[in-house]
Amino acid sequence: MFFRQRPAANATLSYLFGCAGLQKAVAVDVVAGDEDWFIEEAQRAGAPIVHVIDTHVHADHYSGGPELARRVGAAYHLHESNIGRVGFDFSPLRDGQRLEAGNVVVDVIHTPGHTPDSVCLAVRDLRRGDEPWFVITGDTLFVGAVGRPDLAGQEREMAAQLYDTLQSRLLSLPPELEIYPGHQAGSACGAGLSGKPASTIGFEKRFNPMLSMSREAFVTALTAEIPPQPEDMARIVEANLRGVVPAIA
């Protein structure tokens, strides 16, 4: 397996990984304007991109996912809850679905809370075993923090859902499993994010202050001091729902 993490605009972290041997790659959370980088890195690895995934409809940056998928002829994926919401064709993801890229396999975990459509991606290298190597956590779990719950409205209800998601879907994963989040310090998508670009489930269970709280305390803490919403959020979300990035992006 090859793996690339790309720091991008708005403290976003994007990903490219795949199987060089069988020449297939996966791109995750591509920021508009970075499409050439993904194409060039995939070419260097000798692994054409076959899957492009957004972990949710982003509110803080324009997605380059649809454009990258069009340029390379790959499937573009969002969670199935976006059917009827997104104004263009995409390949829907369902909880428990498995995507293949040669010997690299991606297991989809539906993780609502930050947004209703959020997913995390547990990644395996079948040449080395059937256990996951890492999980891409999108805006659900960050290093030292968790995703904000208010972007879809009903922040207390979403915060409670995020607590349930974290406890049942992510913290039950092996403690040694690496996590790669969708943002690092400087992002508007959460409060108190670390500048570290990666962690493990076990480290976060021990040191992430949001993960040792009761459900009631978690909801209260997460909704007490919500950061300002991302600049131009409404326009960004609308563009990402249409799959058309403005020329100013």
Language-model segment annotations:
Residues 1-48, 121-138, 144:
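Conserved beta-strand hairpin/beta-sheet module of binuclear metal-dependent hydrolase folds
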Residues 82, 89-148:
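Active-site-adjacent scaffolding segments
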Residues 149-156:
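Short glycine-enriched, charge-decorated loop/helix-capping segments at active-site entrances
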Residues 27-30, 48-58, 77-80, 110-113, ...:
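Active-site neighborhood of phospho(di)ester-bond hydrolases with catalytic His/Asp-centered motifs
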Residues 34-77:
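Active-site metal-binding motif and surrounding structural segment of the metallo-beta-lactamase
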Residues 128-129, 133-134, 144, 156-249:
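Divalent-metal (often Zn2+) His-rich catalytic cores of metallo-beta-lactamase-fold enzymes
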Residues 17, 29, 56, 68, ...:
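Divalent metal-coordination and catalytic microenvironments
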Residues 34, 57-62, 83-86, 116-117, ...:
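Active-site environment of divalent metal-dependent phosphoester hydrolases
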